[in-house]
Amino acid sequence: SCEVEIDSFYDDDNNGAGYYNRSADLCSRTWVSFYRDMDGNYCRQELDFFLDRTGIDYIRVEYPNGAVDQYEYNFRWSWENYAQTSIRMSYGPNDVSYLDDVYIGGNRLSGYLDGRNNFVEFQGKR
């Protein structure tokens, strides 16, 4: 018989002595980014990661006429690799985002969101 074990990504955080467990750092604060969307609207995004592998993605869009839209999305997250440099964020069926080349340090979270042409950087807000 052939048995296949389905790995739970790299979520037990028991990475051995060779790697520093980055989950505590990731979950230690709210991560905030300010940017302009494709239409030039001013946007604020906040990401919260929790140790139970859930998270909240909050986006506020301010329009030139003064109107404001706010969106809140829940997601489940996991580390995609042993070195904890890639985060998988699942918002629902067929709705998954990846943050690659993750850097956490100096009150910053940065990486490439869903592709090499989309570098993002968040500042920590305690």
Protein language model annotation of sequence segments:
Residues 3-74, 83-126:
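Lipid interaction determinants
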